[in-house]
């Protein structure tokens, strides 16, 4: 009679994502607010005590009062809408073109040979230095502003799309091909997820470059926009309006970056990076 020994199978161990306590998250949020609040309070105190001349740098409270006044009469809203429209159009045009060319250069050897060399040469030129040439090509109207934003957004998205595709492990693509996945399925299930982290980085850099380009573009023969509002205020020495315009640009950049971070976290739930300690 044979004797059978039963051996228990080891329990499956799954790695759980680290859970950050709610109290720790709340403390971190407060820490991120401390330095801006201290900076604004110091600015206000320096302006009120006369360390900063009002005509050079007005107090934050005066800038906020000016912003409230321009918001009530609709001036700020009109200029803000025009700036957002230009930024959105430029980002869409430059981003789509960069995405297509970056994908072609990253996936195809022929595309790499034909597309990448001229793009590499063009990126050595400061796009803001092309303003005189762009004026000759597209005039000094809306096309100039949108073209500057599109150029500013193009290069970060192109290079990060290209690098994201090239950094994908070729063995994953071969495994997908072995499993019978067609080209479209490989692009969807292997290439796109692998390139997304790099693509999001390119988008964040592109947004910053787009706002910088818009600042310059709206100071060239513009009739509306935050940049035009600042230039008009400069002529009348309205420093509070100039500072308000700078704060609006800064807030637009911050809000767009935060929105992109939220979208990135939701789309890349599978990706676990290093947490700051």
PLM region spans:
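Transmembrane-helix boundary motif in ABC transporter permease subunits
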Residues: 89-119
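Short cytoplasmic-facing helical segments at TM-TM junctions of multi-pass membrane proteins
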Residues: 117, 160, 164-205, 230
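Pore-lining and gate-forming transmembrane alpha-helices of multi-pass membrane transport proteins
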Residues: 86, 232-253
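Generic hydrophobic transmembrane alpha-helix motif, especially the helices
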Residues: 120-156, 163-164
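Transmembrane alpha-helices
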Residues: 147, 151, 183-217, 240, ...
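C-terminal transmembrane helix and the adjacent membrane-cytosol boundary/short C-terminal tail
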Residues: 109, 166, 197, 201, ...
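Transmembrane alpha-helical segments of polytopic membrane transport and secretion proteins
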Residues: 1-37, 258-277
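Periplasmic/extracellular loop-to-transmembrane helix junction in inner-membrane transport proteins
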Residues: 18-26, 49-93
């Amino acid at each position: 009679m044979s004797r059978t020994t039963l051996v228990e199978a080891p329990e499956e161990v799954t790695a759980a994502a680290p859970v950050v306590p709610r109290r720790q998250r709340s403390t971190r949020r407060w820490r991120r607010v401390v330095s801006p609040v201290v900076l604004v309070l110091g600015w206000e105190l320096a302006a009120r005590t006369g360390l900063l001349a009002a005509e050079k740098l007005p107090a934050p409270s005066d800038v906020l009062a000016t912003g409230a006044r321009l918001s009530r009469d609709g001036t700020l809203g009109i200029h803000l809408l025009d700036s957002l429209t230009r930024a959105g159009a430029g980002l869409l045009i430059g981003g789509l073109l960069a995405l297509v060319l970056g994908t072609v250069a990253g996936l195809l050897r022929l595309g790499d040979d034909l597309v990448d060399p001229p793009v590499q040469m063009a990126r050595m030129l400061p796009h803001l230095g092309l303003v005189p040439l762009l004026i000759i090509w597209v005039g000094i109207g809306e096309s100039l502003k949108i073209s500057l934003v599109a150029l500013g957004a193009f290069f970060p998205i192109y290079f990060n799309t290209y690098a994201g595709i090239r950094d994908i492990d070729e063995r994953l693509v071969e495994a997908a091909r072995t499993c019978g996945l067609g080209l479209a399925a490989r692009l969807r299930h292997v290439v796109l997820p692998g390139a997304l982290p790099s693509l999001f980085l390119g988008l964040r850099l592109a947004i910053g470059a787009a706002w910088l380009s818009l600042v310059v573009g709206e100071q060239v023969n513009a009739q509306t926009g935050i940049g035009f509002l600042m230039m008009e205020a400069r002529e009348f020495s309205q420093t509070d309006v100039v500072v308000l315009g700078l704060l609006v640009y800064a807030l637009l950049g911050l809000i767009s970056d935060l929105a992109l971070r939220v979208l990135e976290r939701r789309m890349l739930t599978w990706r676990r990076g290093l947490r700051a300690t």
